[in-house]
């Protein structure tokens, strides 16, 4: 690639929008809204309020707020009428590469993978691009937090939870070490006509891959024990990074997409006293008893998918979260798609809700549960007093495809809900407003929530179809 092409690619990958300003101590009161707190066991609150101050939620309840801890609401508080609107915690995009890649066809913008099969010392947050042009698009879809997974190899590296606001990746990082991500080898051969190896050869490769896992984790445990006994020994960054995982203090995130993969991965992890989390989930229902026995959560990679096999029903992916929840398994929902589509996370949860998953459970699958699994539940994922003021106001039911996010806050800071696409929309709406060209070029401000979007009038001399 030429130097000119690299410069153009780098320029395209930069967002021109500024990060949100720091939170102020002025109170913000959202009134008369339907509030979905995502707190376990709590239904949606109708005609409810949320009071924010600084970077925290200070009060949540029903009715009209008059005082907080005996102190009246400040006279200068910003009051927002939420009539007909819904308030939810910010959505969390799980198992994503958002911020690690910009344009898939431009390798210079791709920082998803490292060379080699084993690199647990790699941390996703270090490679996150704070100027990514995909962040504003994701924020418009309600995604204010991303659980970023590195890719490549068998032990891919350390995942990180980041907020989609900040000048630097250090400012954006919430949980730098949120679990080590590994790719579990396939357990069932693929006897398809396009397979490049025979079933017997695939079995040999599987055994070889499992042996590599055993050897690597055995060496890591031995190195950690040796250095604990004698701190003067040289530090191996790869093995040292697994210390918390081997101690069961951080989760081991295992990519597995079949019943055989999930079963072997869980048994292997529990034999080593690790905390497995399954990433993928296809086939999980077949081994649900094992997952319940060992309390293993599942991150389902997308519901807007076709069945993998011809014998499966059309709604196999749609109903998977509901079937797992019914068996007592904790479920998070991810897009399972390229990061430019993370904006659609609510529709993945909505599909699960439409096919049997309780609505509040579906909301929790993209808010509370990812926060719990990534180690940030003390601040994010729910709306409650003392939690971070990281939340959304929706124009209507958040699971309706016609609903839009009308306001958002990250740690109490109001978020600019604009993207390159929305700016172009506004530009051409202004261009074609009115029945003649007299109003073109005006600087009319777009209303926050238009009553309706109508087709632009035909230009003079142009026949409408």
Residue ranges and their predicted role:
Residues 17-22, 35-49, 61-62, 67-69, ...:
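Acidic, glycine-enriched loop/beta-strand segments at the rims
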Residues 39, 124, 149, 227-317, ...:
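Active-site core of metal-dependent hydrolases
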Residues 134, 139-276, 404, 410, ...:
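Polyanionic/metal-chelating signatures
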Residues 1-10:
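Sec-dependent signal peptide recognition
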Residues 109-113, 121-122, 251, 292, ...:
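His/Asp/Glu-enriched, well-ordered alpha-helical/loop segment
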């Amino acid at each position: 690639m030429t130097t000119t092409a690299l410069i153009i690619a780098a320029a395209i990958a930069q967002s021109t929008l500024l990060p949100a300003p720091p939170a102020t101590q002025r109170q913000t009161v959202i009134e008369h809204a339907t509030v979905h707190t995502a707190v376990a066991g709590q239904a949606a609150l109708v005609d409810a309020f949320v009071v924010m101050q600084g970077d925290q939620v200070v009060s949540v309840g029903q009715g009209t707020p008059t005082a907080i801890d005996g102190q009246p609401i400040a006279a200068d508080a910003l009051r927002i009428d939420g009539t007909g609107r819904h308030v939810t915690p910010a959505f969390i995009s799980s198992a994503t590469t958002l911020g690690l890649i910009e344009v898939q066809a431009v390798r210079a913008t791709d920082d998803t993978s490292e060379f080699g099969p084993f690199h647990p010392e790699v941390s996703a947050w270090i490679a996150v691009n704070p100027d990514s042009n995909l962040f504003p698009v994701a924020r418009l879809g309600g995604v204010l937090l991303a659980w970023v997974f590195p890719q490549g190899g068998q032990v891919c590296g350390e995942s990180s939870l980041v907020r989609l606001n900040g000048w630097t990746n250090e400012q954006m990082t919430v949980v730098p070490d949120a679990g080590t991500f590994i790719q579990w080898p396939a357990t069932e051969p693929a006897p398809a006509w396009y397979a490049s190896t025979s079933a017997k050869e695939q079995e040999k490769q599987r055994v070889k891959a499992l042996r590599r896992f055993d050897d690597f984790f055995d060496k890591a445990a031995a190195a950690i024990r040796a250095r604990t006994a004698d701190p003067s020994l040289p530090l191996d960054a790869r093995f040292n990074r697994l210390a918390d995982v081997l101690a069961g203090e951080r989760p081991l995130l295992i990519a597995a997409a079949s019943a055989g993969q999930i079963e072997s991965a869980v048994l292997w992890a529990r034999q080593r006293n690790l905390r497995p989390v399954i990433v993928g989930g296809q086939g999980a229902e077949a081994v649900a008893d094992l997952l319940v026995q060992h309390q293993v959560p599942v991150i389902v990679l997308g519901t807007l998918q076709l069945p993998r096999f011809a014998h499966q029903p059309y709604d196999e992916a749609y109903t998977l979260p509901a079937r797992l929840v019914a068996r007592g398994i904790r479920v998070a929902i991810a897009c399972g798609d390229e990061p430019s589509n993370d904006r659609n996370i609510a529709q993945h949860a909505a599909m699960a809700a439409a096919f049997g998953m309780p609505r509040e459970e579906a909301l929790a699958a993209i808010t509370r549960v990812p926060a719990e699994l990534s180690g940030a539940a003390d601040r994010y994922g729910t709306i409650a007093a003392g939690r971070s003021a990281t939340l959304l106001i929706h124009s209507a039911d958040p699971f309706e495809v016609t609903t839009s996010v009308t306001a958002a806050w990250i740690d109490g800071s109001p978020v600019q809900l604009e993207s390159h696409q929305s700016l172009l929309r506004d530009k051409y709406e202004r261009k074609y407003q009115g029945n003649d060209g007299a109003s073109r070029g005006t600087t009319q401000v777009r209303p926050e929530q238009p009553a309706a979007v109508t087709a632009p009038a035909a230009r003079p001399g142009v026949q409408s179809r």
